[in-house]
């Protein structure tokens, strides 16, 4: 249970060039790509879900949560995934083993010496600067699941991470929401012929990517 008012608990100060918030496939893709393309950069990855010593892995819902993300088919004869996701698909197929995929994602990120991962930490406070408005630091604190209540609670262990580039690659966009970032969550590079008229041009409305939900249906005969 996260408090609404943040105290000034700082902990050890650590410096990085790129700080990535999230632990899912998208975070693993951002971290591995940044590490491979910016070899001189120090990269920190904050995984904001509680983990045990035996479950320190990337993938979030798509691995530790037991949900298969690649249960797809070839629409119109064209495979939908590219880039890092295409590589991971080639390693596991449509019906991958979630434990195996978790190990694959984690290996593909942690094989780079310029990446440090903070497993089971979440944002406790943050600092910004003006002109232009930007994030400068995040203070992260260890989290753990209360075995009695099931709630995620603050634990012990705090770091303050200072960086130049911050990437919100989380499942819920918590970093973006906390700092009140005024950007778009859509895909700016979509072809204009796929957009509504009011979404076109530099002053067009923000373009929201398609989101899908999964439901569990019971008692169907």
Walk through the language-model features, giving the residues of each.
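Short, Lys/Arg-enriched N-terminal segments with co-localized hydrophobic residues
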Residues: 1-14
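Stable alpha-helical elements in mature extracytoplasmic
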Residues: 26-27, 101, 105, 171-175
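Beta1/beta-strand and adjacent pyrophosphate-binding region of the FAD-binding site
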Residues: 13-26
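Glycine-rich loop(s) and the adjacent beta-strand/alpha-helix scaffold that form part
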Residues: 165-221
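Gly/Ala-rich phosphate-binding loop of Rossmann-like dinucleotide-binding domains
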Residues: 31, 35-36
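Conserved N-terminal/central alpha/beta ligand/cofactor-binding core
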Residues: 9, 39-42, 46-134, 209-210
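Core beta-strand elements of the Rossmann-like FAD/NAD(P) dinucleotide-binding domain
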Residues: 153-165
